[in-house]
């Protein structure tokens, strides 16, 4: 699509030179817009050739130092975080990485260097003449500019050159990428100029264009027009949580609280998870008002975080603390702390909710797992119904197990040892404790080879119940069935974090119960395991969710520089205590 610059506001006004606003943090703005637009067209596929800004470099350098410090302690068993601690998976992946493969990535080079200042027509002609790429020069340059968040003035000089060469015509793609830069640099007046052109030329836009305009308009006195754009999106699809989040923040910025809450309820009604920065905005706004109804809604947000096992970031946690401490007459006091292994808060001494499921929760989860995971069907095409039936009969013929072992997984935990020897070492030590053991394996483990000694596997079978599935079968359905069928006391050993099984559960409550059960039942062998002594990492005794106990709140939060996977939980907490009771 194309449009003519002439006819829509004067060219001098459109390309006026304004000093742009202070650059926002690249880590928050860039990924959002590239993802939002990338779903429509692959506009931002070219990798940057210029260095990232110094703030980003400093952040990456800090992260690198943090990881190096964490890896220096890998030999110390006492310093290991628990298996589900935030950042633990990242550390394990670093440990398992091959250092010979690191540092050999080839830099991506383009045939032109992005300009750092606006160019005139002759300079753009020369740059295009030097361009050797197969792609369109104009598309390549504007994509590079968007990826590197270049100056709006430089991008403006590109579009002015294109317009001069094409009788005032600039392609839609160039315009939208220019809009991206205007939004990123918070050039509100430029956003409005582009908005006027698009509104006059097009009856509707693709979702990426709407997303950019909404985010760009919310900071202006024309922010309500972002709500009209949201309505345009609703005509063809459910707006994204980012679209809703931006409109909510616009309403709060302009003190329209009712609109903000209405949009929030609409977002929740679509079963969308609100962006955490949107929830943070509600707390930031709340510290300036004294309204019990508003306060109740903020407490509902905390319960929403609990029910959906969501964790605020560090900045959000500070906003929550500030809001609590700003409530007049309540004398809330917050502190950032940790939870001891016993489950006691290091700040206030209160005991956090236990990780163990109640009998009712356990039976509910067991029924769901049996129905949606074990008998789910399609996601386990490699496991036949006949084999599952054979396994069920086998389990029912055995006494309840104390520990279920993923045999192949455990055998491969220690690369220096023979696999059958590794498995035998673990089984032998557990058997000495008179535990009922089940080893799950594959049939190839029974065929003698350099890794699987016949005599060692015979010793395994003497000390534990064993079930060997077909070589193409999935292990996990068997492991889950045997563990849950044996009762709430039964634990299991595997390095697999069972992400896929959690994901296939039907609702947030079941997924949360599954993760809670997993944290309380999955045993992780220490990295420093010696064949003569088997040691497990401690299992968390407490549940890592937002929780309220009388006159206190405990809120786990994500640290800024810790990369947490979806199967991990934060290790830092916000502890809030109230010195005076609620008024009657």
From Swiss-Prot:
Binding site for Mg(2+) 1: 406, 475
Transit peptide: 1-43
Post-translational modifications reported in the UniProt record: Degraded by LONP1 following mitochondrial unfolded protein response, probably leading to inhibit translation in mitochondrion.
PRORP domain segment(s): 339-575
Gene3D superfamilies: 3.40.50.11980, Tetratricopeptide repeat domain (1.25.40.10)
Source organism, top-level taxon: Eukaryota
Tissue: Detected, after the onset of hearing, in the organ of Corti around the afferent and efferent synapses of the inner hair cells and the efferent synapses of the outer hair cells.
GO biological process assignments: mitochondrial tRNA 5'-end processing
Main localisation: mitochondrion
EC number(s) from the headed UniProt entry: 3.1.26.5
Cofactor annotation: Mg(2+); Mn(2+)
One Pfam match: PRORP
Cofactor stoichiometry and binding remark: Binds 2 Mg(2+) or Mg(2+) ions per subunit.
Residues that bind Mg(2+) 2: 476, 496
Any single Gene Ontology cellular-component annotation: mitochondrion
Subcellular location: Mitochondrion
Example GO molecular function: ribonuclease P activity
Chain sites annotated for binding Zn(2+): 345, 348, 554, 575
Domain remark text: Displays a distorted and non-productive active site that probably switches to a fully productive state only upon association with TRMT10C/MRPP1, HSD17B10/MRPP2 and pre-tRNA substrate.
Role noted for this protein: Catalytic ribonuclease component of mitochondrial ribonuclease P, a complex composed of TRMT10C/MRPP1, HSD17B10/MRPP2 and PRORP, which cleaves tRNA molecules in their 5'-ends. The presence of TRMT10C/MRPP1, HSD17B10/MRPP2 is required to catalyze tRNA molecules in their 5'-ends.
Similarity comment text for this entry: Belongs to the PPR family. P subfamily.
Subunit structure: Catalytic component of mitochondrial ribonuclease P, a complex composed of TRMT10C/MRPP1, HSD17B10/MRPP2 and PRORP/MRPP3.
Name of the protein in its database record: Mitochondrial ribonuclease P catalytic subunit
């Amino acid at each position: 699509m194309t449009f003519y610059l002439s006819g829509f506001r004067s060219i001098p006004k459109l390309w006026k030179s304004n000093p742009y606003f202070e650059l926002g943090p690249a880590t928050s703005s860039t990924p959002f817009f590239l993802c939002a637009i990338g779903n429509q067209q692959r506009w931002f596929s070219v990798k940057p050739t210029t260095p990232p800004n110094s703030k980003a470099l400093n952040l990456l350098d800090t992260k690198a130092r943090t990881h190096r410090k964490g890896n220096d302690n890998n030999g110390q068993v006492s310093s290991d975080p628990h298996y589900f601690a935030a950042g633990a998976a990242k550390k394990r992946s670093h440990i398992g990485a091959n250092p010979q493969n690191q540092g050999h990535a080839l830099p991506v080079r383009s045939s032109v260097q992005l300009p750092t200042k606006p160019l005139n027509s002759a300079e753009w002609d020369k740059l295009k003449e030097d361009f050797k790429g197969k792609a369109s020069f104009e598309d390549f340059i504007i994509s590079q500019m968007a990826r590197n968040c270049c100056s709006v003035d430089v991008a403006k000089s590109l579009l002015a050159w294109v317009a001069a060469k094409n009788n005032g015509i600039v392609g839609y793609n160039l315009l939208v990428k220019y809009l991206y830069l205007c939004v990123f640099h918070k050039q509100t007046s430029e956003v409005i100029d582009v908005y006027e052109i698009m509104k006059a030329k097009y009856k509707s836009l693709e979702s990426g264009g709407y997303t950019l305009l909404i985010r760009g308009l919310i900071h202006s006195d024309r922010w309500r027009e972002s709500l009209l754009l949201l309505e345009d999106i609703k005509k063809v699809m459910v707006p994204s949580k980012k679209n809703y989040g931006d409109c909510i923040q616009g309403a709060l910025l302009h003190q329209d609280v009712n609109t903000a809450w209405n949009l929030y309820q609409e977002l929740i009604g679509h079963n969308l998870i609100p962006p955490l920065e949107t929830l943070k905005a509600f707390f930031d706004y709340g510290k300036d008002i004294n309204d019990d109804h508003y306060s109740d809604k903020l407490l509902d947000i905390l319960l929403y975080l609990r029910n959906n096992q969501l964790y605020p970031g560090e900045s959000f946690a500070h906003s929550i603390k500030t809001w609590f401490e700003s409530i007049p007459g309540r004398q809330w006091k917050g502190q950032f702390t940790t939870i001891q292994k016993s489950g006691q808060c290091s700040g206030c001494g209160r005991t956090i909710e236990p990780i163990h499921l109640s009998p009712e929760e356990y039976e509910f989860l067991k029924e769901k797992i049996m129905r949606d995971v074990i008998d789910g069907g399609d996601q386990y095409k490699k496991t036949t119904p006949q084999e599952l039936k054979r396994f069920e009969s086998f389990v029912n013929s055995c006494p309840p197990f104390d520990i279920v072992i993923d045999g192949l997984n455990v055998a491969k935990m220690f690369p220096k040892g023979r696999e059958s020897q590794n498995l035998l070492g673990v089984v032998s030590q557990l058997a000495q404790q008179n535990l009922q053991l089940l080893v799950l394996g594959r049939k190839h483990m029974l065929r003698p080879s350099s890794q699987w000694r016949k005599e060692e596997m015979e010793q395994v079978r003497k000390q534990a119940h064993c079930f060997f599935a077909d070589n193409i079968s999935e292990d996990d359905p068997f492991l889950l069935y045997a563990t849950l069928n044996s009762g709430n006391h039964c634990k299991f050993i595997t390095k697999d974090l069972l992400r896929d099984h959690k994901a296939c559960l039907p609702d947030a409550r079941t997924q949360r119960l599954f993760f809670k059960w997993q944290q309380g039942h999955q045993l992780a062998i220490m990295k420093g395991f010696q064949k003569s002594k088997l040691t497990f990492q401690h299992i968390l005794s407490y549940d890592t969710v937002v929780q309220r106990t009388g006159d206190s709140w405990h809120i786990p939060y994500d640290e800024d520089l810790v990369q947490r996977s979806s199967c991990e939980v934060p290790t830092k907490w916000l502890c809030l205590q109230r010195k005076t009771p609620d008024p009657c």
